[in-house]
Amino acid sequence: MSLRIQCVCIDCADPAVLARWWADVLGWRVTADEGDEAVIEPPAGSREDGVVPDVVFLRVPEPKTVKNRLHLDLRPVDQQAELARVEALGAKRVDIGQGDDKTWVVYADPEGNEFCVLRALTPEEVAEDG
């Protein structure tokens, strides 16, 4: 394949704050904070295959006003523990019309960007992830 995703960019009002928040949520590290742009990367050694992109937070002047057209889906080992953890970090549950019968929960980060915490990994999936 000749292309790969280098990074995922998220528009925001305060790149430094949102990068730190997402780094805490994902267990990643902030590797750049240059005022209008901040970058988080996964821990060293977690992307030897080059598949995991950086996340870049870019300052924009306009506030978020509608539902995201792109969002992150996070797959935990223990969904209930992660729901409690992201809420303790400041994530807010949001209703985007998903209903109560879903295996995922929709949240918003401190600037209102939606993301989902999916069902927990099965033991087989955990073993595959090593």
Q: Where are these predicted regions, by residue range?
A:
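Short acidic, gly/pro-rich beta-turn/loop elements at beta-sheet edges
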Residues: 18-20, 50, 65-67, 82-84, ...
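A structural detector for beta-sheet-dominated domains
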Residues: 41-43, 58, 75
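Vicinal oxygen chelate
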Residues: 3, 5-12, 32, 39-41, 53, 60-81, 85, ...
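Short loop segments at secondary-structure junctions
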Residues: 13-14, 43-45, 77, 110, ...
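Core segments of cupin and vicinal oxygen chelate
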Residues: 2, 9-53, 82, 88, ...
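Acidic pyrophosphate-coordinating catalytic loop
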Residues: 43-49, 62-65, 112
